[in-house]
Amino acid sequence: MAVGKFLLGSLLLLSLQLGQGWGPDARGVPVADGEFSSEQVAKAGGTWLGTHRPLARLRRALSGPCQLWSLTLSVAELGLGYASEEKVIFRYCAGSCPRGARTQHGLALARLQGQGRAHGGPCCRPTRYTDVAFLDDRHRWQRLPQLSAAACGCGG
C-alpha cells in the first residue's frame, strides 16, 4: 500500500510540475481575476482553490462569477461507499450567473419571468467532467467516471 501511495503521490507531483494539475494559491483565492471561463483558466494553467475556512469559501464562491473550485478530500468523504485512505481532488462549479438572454431559451425565459409565469434563472453547473482514479484499501485501482467537473458554465 505504501508503494501505491508513493507512486500516486509522485504522479500527482509530476502532473503539477508539468502544468497538468492545479496548485494552491498563497492567498487562497482564484489565481485569475476578472471574467474568465473555467476552460480558459484551465488551458492557461490557472488555479481555483479556496481557503481552509468553509463558510468564507462558500460566501466567496457564491458571490463571484460561475467558476471551477477544488477541494482535496479523502475518498470516504465523497460518500460513494469506497474504502480508501487516498486523497482526491474534487472539482465543482459555484458562483453567480448573469440573467442575460444569450439564447432563444434565455429570451423566452426572461419574458416569462417578467410576467411571473416562470421562476429561477441561469445556474452555474459543470459543462464537462473528468474521471477520478484512486487505489482502494484492497490495492485495486478504482475509476469513477465523470466524478469531477472540468469546466463550468451558466445554463438554464
From Swiss-Prot:
Residue pairs linked by disulfide bridges in the UniProt entry: C66-C124, C93-C152, C97-C154
Molecular function as annotated in GO: glial cell-derived neurotrophic factor receptor binding; growth factor activity; receptor tyrosine kinase binding; signaling receptor binding
Range of residues in the leader sequence: 1-21
Superkingdom per UniProt: Eukaryota
InterPro entries from the UniProt entry: Cystine-knot_cytokine, GDNF_fam, TGF-b_C
SMART domains referenced in this protein's UniProt entry, alphabetically: TGFB
A cellular component term, taken from the record's GO annotations: extracellular space
Keywords of the record: Disulfide bond, Growth factor, Secreted, Signal
Record function comment: Growth factor that exhibits neurotrophic activity on mesencephalic dopaminergic and motor neurons. Acts by binding to its coreceptor, GFRA4, leading to autophosphorylation and activation of the RET receptor.
Assembly mode: Homodimer; disulfide-linked. Interacts with GFRA4 coreceptor and RET: forms a 2:2:2 ternary complex composed of PSPN ligand, GFRA4 and RET receptor.
Family to which the UniProt record says this protein belongs: Belongs to the TGF-beta family. GDNF subfamily.
Protein name: Persephin
Source organism: Homo sapiens
